[in-house]
Swiss-Prot record:
Family: Belongs to the TRAPP small subunits family. Sedlin subfamily.
SUPFAM superfamilies: SNARE-like (SSF64356)
Protein name: Trafficking protein particle complex subunit 2-like protein
Gene3D superfamilies: 3.30.450.70
Coiled coil ranges: none
Organism of derivation: Dictyostelium discoideum
Domain of life: Eukaryota
InterPro entries linked: Longin-like_dom_sf (IPR011012), Sedlin (IPR006722), TRAPPC2L (IPR044760)
GO biological process, one term: endoplasmic reticulum to Golgi vesicle-mediated transport
CC annotations in GO: cytoplasm; nucleus; TRAPP complex
PANTHER family reported for this sequence: TRAFFICKING PROTEIN PARTICLE COMPLEX SUBUNIT 2
Length: 140
Protein backbone atom coordinates (compact mmCIF):
# COMPACT_ATOMS: atom_id res chain seq x y z
CA UNK A 1 0.00 0.00 0.00
CA UNK A 2 1.39 3.36 -1.01
CA UNK A 3 1.80 5.91 1.74
CA UNK A 4 1.90 8.95 -0.55
CA UNK A 5 -1.45 9.96 -1.97
CA UNK A 6 -0.47 13.22 -3.68
CA UNK A 7 2.66 15.17 -4.64
CA UNK A 8 2.43 18.85 -5.49
CA UNK A 9 4.93 21.50 -6.53
CA UNK A 10 3.73 25.08 -6.31
CA UNK A 11 5.49 28.15 -7.72
CA UNK A 12 6.44 31.30 -5.85
CA UNK A 13 3.22 32.96 -7.03
CA UNK A 14 1.22 30.03 -5.61
CA UNK A 15 0.60 28.71 -9.12
CA UNK A 16 0.53 24.91 -9.45
CA UNK A 17 3.56 23.63 -11.35
CA UNK A 18 2.89 19.93 -10.78
CA UNK A 19 0.11 18.04 -8.99
CA UNK A 20 -0.18 14.29 -9.23
CA UNK A 21 -2.37 11.83 -7.35
CA UNK A 22 -0.88 8.42 -6.58
CA UNK A 23 -3.77 6.47 -5.09
CA UNK A 24 -5.17 3.80 -7.36
CA UNK A 25 -8.63 3.99 -5.79
CA UNK A 26 -9.05 7.76 -5.99
CA UNK A 27 -12.37 9.17 -7.17
CA UNK A 28 -12.96 12.54 -8.80
CA UNK A 29 -14.38 13.80 -5.51
CA UNK A 30 -11.28 12.69 -3.58
CA UNK A 31 -9.06 14.17 -6.29
CA UNK A 32 -10.78 17.52 -5.81
CA UNK A 33 -10.38 17.15 -2.04
CA UNK A 34 -6.64 16.58 -2.44
CA UNK A 35 -6.29 19.68 -4.60
CA UNK A 36 -8.18 21.62 -1.93
CA UNK A 37 -5.88 20.26 0.79
CA UNK A 38 -2.81 21.31 -1.22
CA UNK A 39 -4.30 24.77 -1.75
CA UNK A 40 -5.07 25.17 1.97
CA UNK A 41 -1.54 24.16 2.89
CA UNK A 42 -0.18 27.20 1.04
CA UNK A 43 -1.63 29.51 3.71
CA UNK A 44 -0.02 27.41 6.41
CA UNK A 45 3.36 27.54 4.65
CA UNK A 46 3.18 31.34 4.48
CA UNK A 47 2.26 31.55 8.17
CA UNK A 48 4.89 29.04 9.29
CA UNK A 49 7.62 30.82 11.32
CA UNK A 50 10.42 28.88 9.59
CA UNK A 51 9.28 29.78 6.07
CA UNK A 52 11.21 33.08 6.12
CA UNK A 53 14.56 31.55 7.08
CA UNK A 54 17.25 31.33 4.43
CA UNK A 55 19.31 28.41 5.74
CA UNK A 56 19.20 25.24 3.61
CA UNK A 57 18.69 23.13 6.72
CA UNK A 58 15.42 24.97 7.34
CA UNK A 59 13.85 24.02 4.00
CA UNK A 60 11.90 21.15 5.52
CA UNK A 61 8.77 22.55 7.16
CA UNK A 62 7.55 19.28 8.64
CA UNK A 63 3.93 18.45 9.29
CA UNK A 64 1.78 21.31 8.04
CA UNK A 65 -1.50 19.90 9.27
CA UNK A 66 -3.42 16.67 9.67
CA UNK A 67 -6.89 16.08 8.22
CA UNK A 68 -9.33 13.24 8.88
CA UNK A 69 -7.68 10.93 6.37
CA UNK A 70 -4.32 12.52 5.53
CA UNK A 71 -1.23 14.27 6.85
CA UNK A 72 0.27 17.12 4.84
CA UNK A 73 4.02 17.83 4.83
CA UNK A 74 5.87 20.74 3.26
CA UNK A 75 9.25 21.84 1.98
CA UNK A 76 10.14 25.38 0.91
CA UNK A 77 13.14 26.19 -1.26
CA UNK A 78 15.12 29.40 -1.07
CA UNK A 79 13.50 30.42 -4.37
CA UNK A 80 10.05 30.07 -2.73
CA UNK A 81 9.08 26.93 -4.65
CA UNK A 82 6.85 24.83 -2.40
CA UNK A 83 6.89 21.04 -2.35
CA UNK A 84 3.88 19.44 -0.68
CA UNK A 85 3.11 15.79 -0.11
CA UNK A 86 -0.11 14.32 1.22
CA UNK A 87 0.21 10.93 2.92
CA UNK A 88 -2.30 8.57 4.48
CA UNK A 89 -3.03 9.40 8.11
CA UNK A 90 -2.24 5.82 9.08
CA UNK A 91 1.31 6.17 7.74
CA UNK A 92 4.07 6.43 10.32
CA UNK A 93 6.90 8.22 8.54
CA UNK A 94 10.16 9.48 10.03
CA UNK A 95 11.20 13.08 9.45
CA UNK A 96 14.58 11.91 8.15
CA UNK A 97 12.83 9.85 5.45
CA UNK A 98 10.63 12.80 4.52
CA UNK A 99 13.62 15.15 4.27
CA UNK A 100 15.40 12.69 1.99
CA UNK A 101 12.28 12.30 -0.16
CA UNK A 102 11.90 16.08 -0.51
CA UNK A 103 15.57 16.51 -1.42
CA UNK A 104 15.28 13.84 -4.12
CA UNK A 105 12.09 15.43 -5.42
CA UNK A 106 13.80 18.82 -5.52
CA UNK A 107 16.72 17.32 -7.45
CA UNK A 108 14.30 15.86 -10.02
CA UNK A 109 12.58 19.24 -10.30
CA UNK A 110 15.87 21.10 -10.75
CA UNK A 111 17.02 18.66 -13.44
CA UNK A 112 13.72 19.06 -15.29
CA UNK A 113 13.50 22.85 -15.05
CA UNK A 114 17.13 23.28 -16.06
CA UNK A 115 16.11 22.20 -19.54
CA UNK A 116 16.51 25.20 -21.89
CA UNK A 117 13.09 24.42 -23.41
CA UNK A 118 11.30 24.70 -20.06
CA UNK A 119 9.49 28.01 -19.64
CA UNK A 120 10.15 29.21 -16.05
CA UNK A 121 7.20 29.23 -13.67
CA UNK A 122 5.01 27.14 -15.99
CA UNK A 123 3.47 23.71 -15.44
CA UNK A 124 5.86 20.80 -15.62
CA UNK A 125 4.42 18.52 -18.29
CA UNK A 126 7.44 16.31 -18.88
CA UNK A 127 6.57 12.62 -19.14
CA UNK A 128 10.06 11.77 -17.93
CA UNK A 129 9.57 13.90 -14.79
CA UNK A 130 6.23 12.23 -14.08
CA UNK A 131 7.82 8.80 -14.49
CA UNK A 132 10.72 9.70 -12.18
CA UNK A 133 8.35 11.03 -9.52
CA UNK A 134 6.20 7.91 -9.88
CA UNK A 135 9.32 5.80 -9.34
CA UNK A 136 10.32 7.92 -6.31
CA UNK A 137 6.96 7.67 -4.50
CA UNK A 138 7.33 4.02 -3.35
CA UNK A 139 10.69 4.87 -1.74
CA UNK A 140 8.92 6.53 1.18
Amino acid sequence: MKKIVCVAIVGKGNNPLFIQDFSSSITDENKLKLHYIVHCSLDIIEDKPGSNKKLPSDMYLGLLYPTEDYKVYGYLTNTKIKFIIVVLDTSDIKDSDLKLFFKRLQTLFINTTSNPFYKPNSKVESKKFLQEVTNLVPSL
